[in-house]
Amino acid sequence: MPKGEPYIPETITVHLGRPDADAMNVEVPFADYIKNVASSEIYPTWPEAALRANIYAIITFALNRIYTEWYRSRGYPFDITDSTQYDQKYTYGREVFENINRLVDEQLNTYIRRQGTIEPLFAAFCNGTTVTCEGLSQWGTVGLAEQGYSPYDILTYYYGDSIDLVQNVPVQTSMQSYPGFPLELGYSGEDVRLLQIQLNRISRNYPAIPKIGEITGS
């Protein structure tokens, strides 16, 4: 279940295989994960606008997996896999490219969302040559960048005009929506505060649910 406003997690847990494969899980800093994926998915020689557009998509895809608890809600002890069949390519132990390292540092606190929503977009992408999809074409971004498209223009070309780039997103420790025990009357603290945020978010779609006036965790 979504956990209030999205944030940039300090770390992400990656499963080094297909979801059901007997493979190792590694917890890595989120920034290092994005740099690794970008260095594994795209080429550092591409135009900067293409690189930036792809990095926005990579960040957003990972945040969507974390925010929706796609794997954890299904009982898996990880946030994302390294399989391009399911997620995006993570190469355990690889070096990253210098310019991609710099661009990720500049863009890390930004993600894509659909206007009118708060959750990170499911920013699907593929290489656009051997594999095509309804989302972003990695090689297609190169041609658009060479035509003078900005990173945002490239993103709207593939994901539509109804997207925003959310900037200055805070970094915090990742927390699952279920604390591991039932909350009871009289409880207070961060778990209660998160539940209050969730209820207020749900009430946007179901107005009959009254909003909690002050989010205090008590």
Task: Identify the residue ranges that each predicted region occupies.
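Conserved, single-site charged/polar hotspot
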Residues: M1-S218
